[in-house]
Design a protein with these regions (language model features):
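N-terminal segments that mediate ammonia production and transfer
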Residues: 1-176, 185-186, 194-195, 199-203, ...
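Structural motif
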Residues: 11-13, 20-21, 29-30, 38-40, ...
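Short acidic (Asp/Glu) and glycine-rich catalytic loops that position anionic groups and cofactors
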Residues: 108-110, 117-120, 277-284, 306, ...
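Glycine-rich phosphate-binding loops that contact phosphosugars or nucleotide phosphates
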Residues: 173-328, 362
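A general structural motif
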Residues: 212-213, 336-342, 384-392
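Acidic catalytic cores of enzymes that act on phosphate-bearing nucleotides/polynucleotides
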Residues: 350-392
C-alpha cells in the first residue's frame, strides 16, 4: 500500500507468499506497457507514459467463446522476463484456458504525456486545478458552439460524440429515455446535465433523469434497453461502478455516450460516442474534483442541446440565450477567483467558529449545494447535510 501526498490517491495490491509475482485486478482497468527490455503494469495509462507510449489493455468483459459467455469472460496474462518488452513475451489466455494470441494491432499508443500531470509552481494540485477551472471550461466549449442561419448559437458535436446510429434513433423517436449516470462528483454533474436535457426537450415524449450508476445497475435494469440512451460521466474514465454499469446497459441494447476527461481511458473504449471535457487531456490529480466538475456541467449542456437538435426541437432564441450565458461563465469564474482574499477572510471568520454546517439550495442551485457538500466532506472531513432551502 502506498500513498502519494501530492495526489492523495490510495493504491492497493494483494500479494501472497506463494505467488508474490502475481497481480490481480477486478473491475478496474489493467494495462501492460511495452518498454525497452521491460514490461510495466498499471491501472491507468498515466502510470505508463513516463516509460512508454505503447500498451495493451486487458479486456475482462468480452467472452472469448460466445457459447460459454460466463466461463470464458476474463483474461490471464503471463509476462516472460527473458522476452520483456516484446509481444513474444506476452501470453494471454481466457479464464476457460483458451489461448488468446496478442497481435501488434491490439497495441494502443498513448495520447497523453508526463506534461499533462505537471504540478507547475503550485504548492498542491487542488489549488492548481481550482485556478485552472475557467480555462478548462473554455476548452470544453471551444469548437462546440456554432451558429445557425440566423446567427443564433447552437451546439456542434461530431459523429465521434453522436454516431450516425444514435442520431438516427433520436430522429426516429426510437429513444424515449435518457439516463445520465456517474458516481460522486460526476453524479452531481449528471444531475445538472439531466435537468438541462429535460428542459431542452420541452414537451417531447422523452424522459431524462440522473440515477447514480450503482442505483441503475443494482435496481433499475430492464432486459431490453434498446430505447435508452445512457450518458456516462467520469473524470478519469476508470470509475469501476460507472464502467460496470456501462457494460450491463450495452449488453441490453442501450446506446452510450461518455463525457470523460482522459483520452485512452477504459470508458472511452466502452462507449459508442465520446464528448471530451476540455481537450481530453486536462488531467485532474486531486481527489477533490473541481475543474472537472465545471467542465462536465458545460459538456452536459452542450450534449443536451445537441440531443434536442437531433429530435427536432426548434427554439432558436431560447437556445441562443442559454448558450450565450454558458459562454460567459469562464469570465464569471475568473471574477470569483479574483476575490480569493475576501473569500479566505470569510472562511477564517466563520468556519472555525461553527461546529455544524449545512448547505442549502433550490432548483439548479441544489446541484451546486450537493456538490459543495462533497467538496467540504472530502477536504474538511466533516459530515455535512445538503438540502433544499425549505427543508432546513
Amino acid at each position: 500500500m502506498a500513498q502519494n501526498p501530492d495526489v492523495a490517491n490510495l493504491g492497493l495490491a494483494p500479494v501472497t507468499v506463494r505467488h508474490d509475482h502475481a497481480l490481480r485486478g477486478s473491475g478496474q482497468a489493467l494495462y501492460v506497457g511495452l518498454c525497452d527490455d521491460a514490461f510495466v503494469v498499471a491501472s491507468e495509462p498515466y502510470g505508463l507514459v513516463e516509460l512508454t507510449d505503447r500498451y495493451l489493455r486487458m479486456d475482462g468483459e468480452t467472452p472469448s467463446n460466445p457459447d460459454d459467455p460466463t466461463g470464458s469472460r476474463g483474461q490471464i496474462i503471463e509476462l516472460e522476463a527473458a522476452l520483456a518488452g516484446t509481444l513474444e513475451g506476452i501470453r494471454r489466455r481466457s479464464y476457460d484456458g483458451s489461448e488468446l494470441p496478442v497481435t501488434g494491432d491490439e497495441l494502443t499508443h498513448a495520447e497523453i504525456t508526463t506534461r499533462d500531470i505537471d504540478r507547475g509552481h503550485y504548492p498542491h494540485f487542488l489549488l492548481k486545478e481550482i485556478t485552472e477551472s475557467p480555462v478548462s471550461f473554455r476548452k470544453t466549449l471551444r469548437g462546440r458552439l456554432g451558429t445557425d442561419g440566423n446567427g443564433r448559437l447552437r451546439a456542434v458535436v461530431g459523429d465521434e460524440t453522436l454516431p450516425p446510429r444514435l442520431r438516427s434513433q433520436l430522429a426516429a423517436g426510437a429513444i424515449d429515455e435518457i439516463l445520465v449516470i456517474g458516481q460522486g462528483t460526476a453524479a452531481s454533474a449528471g444531475r445538472a446535465a439531466a435537468a438541462a436535457t429535460a428542459e431542452r426537450l420541452g414537451d417531447r415524449d422523452i424522459s431524462a433523469r440522473s440515477p447514480p450508476a450503482t442505483e441503475l445497475s443494482g435496481f433499475q435494469l430492464e432486459n431490453d434497453l434498446s430505447n435508452v440512451l445512457v450518458v456516462a460521466i467520469s473524470q478519469s474514465g476508470t470509475t469501476t461502478d460507472t464502467n460496470r454499469t456501462v457494460d450491463l446497459v450495452r449488453a441490453r441494447g442501450a446506446g452510450v455516450v461518455a463525457i470523460v476527461n482522459r483520452r485512452g481511458s477504459d470508458l472511452v473504449d466502452k462507449a459508442d460516442g465520446v464528448l471530451y471535457t476540455a481537450d481530453g487531456r486536462d488531467v485532474e490529480m486531486s481527489v477533490a474534483s473541481t475543474k472537472a466538475f465545471y467542465s462536465q456541467v458545460a459538456a452536459g449542456f452542450i450534449l443536451a442541446d445537441a440531443i434536442a437538435g437531433e429530435v427536432g426541437v426548434d427554439d432558436g432564441d431560447r437556445r441562443h440565450s442559454l448558450l450565450a450565458a454558458l459562454s460567459q461563465m469562464p469570465a464569471a469564474m475568473e471574477a470569483t477567483l479574483a476575490r480569493r482574499p475576501e473569500i479566505a477572510e470569510a472562511a477564517r471568520q466563520f468556519a472555525p467558529a461553527r461546529r455544524y454546517w449545512a448547505i442549502v439550495g433550490n432548483g439548479p442551485n441544489l446541484v451546486a449545494a450537493r456538490e459543495l457538500r462533497i467538496k467540504l466532506s472530502e477536504l474538511c472531513y466533516k459530515s455535512i447535510a445538503a438540502d433544499s432551502t425549505e427543508d432546513k
